[in-house]
């Protein structure tokens, strides 16, 4: 969760988001983004009517399976009213591992991955399609993995992510791992 979020702001954002969805008859998984100023005033930025890349952070903190709920919603199967029972559980952080060279202004780093090891363990999730032998093409989406960590506190989540990044091994191409550390 955002380090500036409090219960009052969360409730206001929730109500505004519900109103926005009802106003356009939107049903399904999605994200509404807001900007918050120094006085805790919030401003609508955009609505994404799709699952976001960052959805694992929400899943870990709220204990929900957003993909499952999206499928149920599109199948017109009523979703449980989980908002009344939802509880925030700790903090989660996501780092995107990209095939880019941070020392060269994040230039693309195509090539064959010769060695590939991602972290694991309690509170660590890795979403990836890459593997040793995978060829990262020149014209591509540079993200090769997402590392998501969950812990009881923000400080512990940062510590867990630091350890997870230290466990990563990607050889044969340059990645953003050194930058993320």
Task: State each model region's role.
Residues 1-181:
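ATP-dependent carboxylate activation and anion-phosphoryl transfer catalytic cores
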């Amino acid at each position: 969760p955002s380090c500036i979020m409090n219960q009052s702001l969360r409730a206001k954002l929730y109500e505004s988001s519900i109103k926005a969805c009802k106003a356009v008859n939107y049903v399904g998984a999605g994200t509404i983004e807001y900007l918050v100023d120094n006085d805790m005033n919030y401003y609508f930025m955009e609505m994404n009517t799709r699952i976001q890349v960052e959805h694992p952070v929400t899943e870990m903190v709220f204990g929900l399976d957003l993909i499952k709920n999206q499928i149920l919603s599109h199948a017109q199967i009523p979703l449980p009213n989980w908002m009344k029972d939802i509880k925030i559980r700790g903090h989660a952080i996501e780092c995107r591992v990209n095939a880019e060279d941070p020392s060269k202004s994040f230039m693309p780093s195509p090539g064959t991955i010769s060695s590939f090891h991602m972290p694991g363990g309690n509170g660590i999730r890795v979403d990836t399609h890459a593997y040793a032998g995978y060829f990262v093409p020149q014209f591509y989406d540079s993200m090769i993995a997402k590392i998501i960590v969950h812990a009881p506190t923000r400080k512990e989540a940062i510590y867990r992510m630091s350890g997870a990044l230290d466990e990563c091994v990607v050889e044969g191409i340059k990645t953003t791992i050194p930058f993320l550390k």
